[in-house]
Amino acid sequence: MTVRVAINGFGRIGRNVVRALYESGRRAEITVVAINELADAAGMAHLLKYDTSHGRFAWEVRQERDQLCVGDDAIRVLHERSLQSLPWRELGVDVVLDCTGVYGSREHGEAHIAAGAKKVLFSHPGSNDLDATVVYGVNQDQLRAEHRIVSNASCTTNCIIPVIKLLDDAYGIESGTVTTIHSAMHDQQVIDAYHPDLRRTRAASQSIIPVDTKLAAGITRFFPQFNDRFEAIAVRVPTINVTAIDLSVTVKKPVKANEVNLLLQKAAQGAFHGIVDYTELPLVSVDFNHDPHSAIVDGTQTRVSGAHLIKTLVWCDNEWGFANRMLDTTLAMATVAFR
């Protein structure tokens, strides 16, 4: 069957989900029937067609009254502020992809369900009372038909969780630290301006800016045994896309750097193919733009100190990789629910 999807919020992730759907050739499996976005339809069409990070969209895009047309497909455009007013029942929506970055509670998910959607997938970490949080490639097989309100976690969680799992399964992780080196985001300023976080009052293009992160909590959500044994910090850097994560873990078993690389390379070619990639090329962040993997391990940067301290550098396109995982998780939810 074809999964009927509605998108709530047509920002960076919402637009990339649509682009990824068309570029990946999965339109026979997923069809977008509606997009709810407060911005005007002309702006939506323009930003879908022209993207500073990902270039010009190959499909024809045009606006026709209350529709956004992509090729021969017509997608209904809505401008509803209230979740309760959304016509999901009328449109026969199977899964809502909530890409607002604002909603993430069970209450918000239930509002989509009350409006007629069968399932909801949030594009960001949700509250602890959601039915499931999925990192595709790691735990999507735990989805059940009764799981109606699900989170796809975050781009950084999707990037680092597969690598942590591989290292823990092989060597037994005792503790770890993570530093996220993240491209600038929409909640930063173009020039100095007011913000509740005083560091984010500063111009995004001129500084490396430390910000708060809940990545450690995201890690322990998947690995409860690491509670109080993982810490994370994050900085934003003056680039517009692609993120690097510096992961350091102490492990129980002694290991060498080449053994770590071999483990991760084999995983990229085997069980985690399509989710994790591995490279030893002398690449920089822009080279990972538009990469669909959740994580790309940079084998040139792997280090081991004292046989028990492993340091790795993992890249991801925090937009494109995550948008592709949104599609993967949508299909996984539909498979268990509607088969």
Swiss-Prot record:
Main function: Catalyzes the NAD-dependent conversion of D-erythrose 4-phosphate to 4-phosphoerythronate.
UniProt-annotated binding residues for substrate: 154-156, 200, 213-214, 236
CDD domains: GAPDH_C_E4PDH, GAPDH_N_E4PDH
InterPro entries named in the record: E4P_DH_bac (IPR006422), GlycerAld/Erythrose_P_DH (IPR020831), GlycerAld_3-P_DH_AS (IPR020830), GlycerAld_3-P_DH_cat (IPR020829), GlycerAld_3-P_DH_NAD(P)-bd (IPR020828), NAD(P)-bd_dom_sf (IPR036291)
Catalytic activity of the protein: D-erythrose 4-phosphate + NAD(+) + H2O = 4-phospho-D-erythronate + NADH + 2 H(+)
Gene Ontology annotations for the cellular component aspect, listed alphabetically: cytoplasm
Keyword NAD in record: yes
EC numbers for this chain: 1.2.1.72
Matches recorded under PROSITE patterns: GAPDH
Chief site of localization: cytoplasm
Keywords: Cytoplasm, NAD, Oxidoreductase, Pyridoxine biosynthesis
Name of this protein: D-erythrose-4-phosphate dehydrogenase
Subunit structure: Homotetramer.
RNA-binding recorded as keyword: no
Species: Escherichia fergusonii (strain ATCC 35469 / DSM 13698 / CCUG 18766 / IAM 14443 / JCM 21226 / LMG 7866 / NBRC 102419 / NCTC 12128 / CDC 0568-73)
Catalytic-site annotation from UniProt: 155 (nucleophile)
Gene label: epd
Pathways per UniProt: Cofactor biosynthesis; pyridoxine 5'-phosphate biosynthesis; pyridoxine 5'-phosphate from D-erythrose 4-phosphate: step 1/5
HAMAP family the UniProt entry points to: E4P_dehydrog (MF_01640)
First-level EC class: oxidoreductase
Cellular localisation: Cytoplasm
A Pfam family per the record: Gp_dh_C
